Amino acid sequence: MRCRRLCAFDAARGPRRLMRVGLALILVGHVNLLLGAVLHGTVLRHVANPRGAVTPEYTTANVISVGSGLLSVSLGLVALLASRNLFRPRLHWALLALALVNLLLSAACSLGLLLAVSLTVANGGRRLIADCHPGLLDPLVPLDQGSGHADCPFDPTKIYDTALALWIPSVFMSAAEAALSGYCCVAALTLRGVGPCRKDGLQEQLEELTELEFPKRKWQENVQLLDQTREIRTSQKSWV
């Protein structure tokens, strides 16, 4: 029963759902990529330095977030192509490979961002500005005090709020990327007839639906041609 719920790709609504998932991946990927870029521009570029004052979890989480956004956009494009070309095995395998990689990367991104948020909340953002304020590693020293405060090129009281305001949406975006990538994996496995999502007669059903849709598309094209011809004739008469 659980397997049936997970393997939700069918011949009737599966291609349209795959197309919507592809569009959603492109949108979510762009948003996550934008959040990662804004985070780097507003927070990490101030506190990152060669001396390693910024702990690796912050930089790693941000890099993975940007990479996950780029890969999600690529996966969305492949999903759109696969939804319109249901009988091309190469697209199915490409969809499966990209979906698996993006699923793992998005899951790692979510965990990394959760770790970054947890550490930042636990120490009150002091590790973000440890190089500018060496004395602030002591939790008894307020953020707006301590040695080096006058030499900081940024406002230390805003770095904490800005980082959290950008990290928390990134966590949800990464979780959404992982969920959508999981659906793409299911769709690719179903189309290839591999694993527990295999459905007998799916290819035949898709072929029948394609054959039924082809005359309808042809009829719509003919109607459009007739409308265009009428418009041309009307314009010619009005010109005469």
Swiss-Prot record:
Keywords for the protein's UniProt record, in alphabetical order: Membrane, Transmembrane, Transmembrane helix
Compartmental location: Membrane
Domain of life assignment: Eukaryota
Membrane-topology annotation of the record: Multi-pass membrane protein
Keyword Transcription in annotation: no
One Gene Ontology cellular component: membrane
Transmembrane segments: 21-41, 63-83, 95-115, 163-183
Main location: membrane
InterPro entries cross-referenced by the UniProt entry: Beta-casein-like (IPR020977)
Protein's recorded name: Keratinocyte-associated protein 3
Organism (species): Bos taurus
Gene encoding the protein: KRTCAP3
